[in-house]
Amino acid sequence: MTALQNDTFLRALRRQPTEYTPLWLMRQAGRYLPEYNATRARAGSFLGLAKNPAYATEVTLQPLDRYPLDAAILFSDILTVPDAMGLGLSFAQGEGPRFAHPLRTEADVAKLAVPDMASLQYVFDAVSEIRKALVQDGRQRVPLIGFSGSPWTLACYMVEGGGSDDFRTVKAMMYARPDLMHRILDINATAVSAYLNAQIEAGAQAVMVFDTWGGALADGMYQAFSLAYMRKVLQGLKREHDGQQIPVIVFTKGGGIWLEEIAGIGPDAIGLDWTVNLAKARRRTEGRVALQGNIDPTVLFASESAIREQVRGVLDSYASAGGSDGHVFNLGHGISQFTPPENVSVLVDEVHNHSRKLRAGQVAAAV
């Protein structure tokens, strides 16, 4: 196994001491970077980019070449799994993802099956290629994160046929035919576990489950239709590979009211959106998990001084509840395509500098 030059991200997920707070950004390889847009133009389409391991490797490394980030995340899409199930994924310009064959009837659901992981080999090849490309002077620069959508979030797209403002189609099925929804979610959970395990086998050193639409569910429905199936995913995961622990991060956007229950399904870390107070979240989870987050992504449209002030606020909030260890800095959701790249430099600089000062006792956490 190649040694890591920088393992702060993995140590933070294990709640071990780090010299500073590590960070990475959701969608860090994306449309806000001109170099990403140039590569995407060469690929011809988003799917042409995501399904080509060489292109996926190139764009995964682009933010690391621009910023001193502490982790890389596989460039892919959460909808690769339902695409492999035969739902016919496409991306229309300006419209987002669409499925040609959404799950609308009992017959549709009856035909659904866990896909052959060989049909997703392009993802696993990308993981392997990225791991190799991260090696510099005989050591790997930073760890690589693999990921998947949660069973519920995948089901939202699979039933709606694309994105939605109100999820009325998938929710109507959930309320009217819970048996069909449970079948979809059970298949999705099995598929997600297998998909993440294959990423781990290919070289992912941590994995994240994106429950982007869990927060759209009512209390009670969340536990039954999202959390229960993320628990099943985690129960099926390899938590160790090649002699190394594989940390697992779970992120439910809008899930702040359920932190204790999310911690109860056994992740190593919980991702938080910007509506959650970090100090309170830390007290509520009683140090059982690391926390990841959680600055509002739109802060990156503000002035340099405002960005630095907001970064310090996030770091101070976490540190005020018992020191800085066990925190991975991130945005509360994905970075906007309109973000000025130079503002990301300011954020990264302030995270590293202020968190070092907190640990050295040069500044006190403002409460």
UniProtKB/Swiss-Prot annotation:
Pfam (any one): URO-D
Main location: cytoplasm
GO biological process, one term: protoporphyrinogen IX biosynthetic process from glutamate
GO CC terms in record: cytosol
Location of the protein in the cell: Cytoplasm
EC number: 4.1.1.37
One Gene Ontology molecular-function label: uroporphyrinogen decarboxylase activity
UniProt catalytic activity: uroporphyrinogen III + 4 H(+) = coproporphyrinogen III + 4 CO2
Annotated site residues (Transition state stabilizer) in this chain: D77
Stretch forming the signal peptide: none
Binding residues annotated for substrate, in chain numbering: R27, Q28, A29, G30, R31, D77, Y157, T212, H333
General function of this protein: Catalyzes the decarboxylation of four acetate groups of uroporphyrinogen-III to yield coproporphyrinogen-III.
Subunit comment: Homodimer.
The protein's name in its UniProt record: Uroporphyrinogen decarboxylase
Encoding gene, per UniProt annotation: hemE
